[in-house]
Amino acid sequence: MNDHIQPEGSAEHEHGALGDAEYAEFMELAAEEGFDIEDVEGAIDEAGHGPLPVLAVVGRPNVGKSTLVNRIIGRREAVVEDKPGVTRDRVTYEAEWAGRRFKLVDTGGWEQDVLGIDASVAAQAEYAIEAADAVVFVVDAKVGATDTDEAVVRLLRKAGKPVVLCANKVDGQSGEADASYLWALGLGEPHPVSALHGRGTGDMLDAVLEALPEAPAQSFGAAIGGPRRIALIGRPNVGKSSLLNKVAGEDRVVVNEIAGTTRDPVDELIELGGVTWKFVDTAGIRKRVHLQQGADYYASLRTAAAVEKAEVAVILIDASESISVQDQRIVTMAVDAGRAIVLAFNKWDTLDEERRYYLEREIETELLQVAWAPRVNVSARTGRHMEKLVPAIETALDGWETRVPTGRLNAFLGELVAAHPHPVRGGKQPRILFGTQAGTKPPRFVLFASGFIEHGYRRFIERRLREEFGFEGTPIHISVRVREKRGNKKK
């Protein structure tokens, strides 16, 4: 590793990853360059936050979950109705209320006809129990509590997670009377809400903030003690169970040729390379629903659960088959979640020279977004190259936790901008003035510029950051703040 960068071993400061002296010096520089101090503080706070607590929105179909999710995140994302046959690629979003950020999980994409309403809602609750720090349980106040609702209440109560009860579709006084009947569920005060019109959502979100911890229960890093957490993810039948068996040294996971037949075990503590690791269970992506309809959504929901609990995602890909859209979705999910990433290509021992040639071409085109991820070619069946897995995981975690000191970063940016200035656009040439790495896990940079920085130039900066400082195995987030003329606001 480069001698002027270091992994972050401790929790981040109140100024993101900047120490007090570093922060004071940086703010002085920002003031000299004419930036609004509040904007700069906000940018560092936004990029420098630690892991976000997770809030799951759970409820049976047609109670307004998706409408509520859209209301909370402040924009319309995807479908609003719970319709059979409608699924989403994405299930997690970042949200903010009263200055606090959290991750929001929309469980509304589950198709209600797959296993019947009871089983589908139970699957959502299962996710919430597994990965969320708090739960919003949405009930239709007009209909009242159903048997399905009662069943979910039992699951939630058993899990012991904080629950905020949302009585939706309350549009007036009569609706509030309907909502009051939901006290009988035993989950505390029902919050009367109209997700469609926004009525009551603010009060409900205030209650959510009281229920959510400041940081997630699955807090990152070795500082809290315990083994590092690995999510082994990938589409059904790529060999995840076989790989887990091989590294664990025993058949602790039931394996079948039918995709997704693994039963639900708990997280596995496994010793590899003299170190104990916690393999976060991904049974959901392997547990087939025995019906094609809805299985993909169920898989993505459970994969999201595993990724949320982990620090590094080992993405298993079947090297004997073409890289699929589903493989790419799983990769995107891990990147969007900001986890360290290792690519493991399974069934390598079955490939002939022609397939290896075409696989390399596929990797170059289909997995371009993770060209920075360490790669291992393995055989879960024979155990080939299993010893390469741990060094790849350690490399990815190392990159994920690396921080470049502000002084070193600005020296690098100064040299880069002088040698490769931004293209002139409309007679103007925007310049990057200075920047800082406000956070780690993954590395998050805030750059301050004199004008809008094009995406192509941002990609160039990321590429050069990787060349200079490593960051192997981790996504990098770069946000740019523009110095506006007096009287104008940022961006």
From Swiss-Prot:
One of its GO terms (biological process) is ribosome biogenesis. Associates with the 50S ribosomal subunit. The keyword Glycosyltransferase does not apply. Residues 402-484 form the KH-like domain. This is GTPase Der. InterPro entries: AAA+_ATPase, G_ENGA, GTP-bd, GTPase_Der, KH_dom-like, KH_dom-like_a/b, P-loop_NTPase, Small_GTP-bd. CDD domains: EngA1, EngA2.
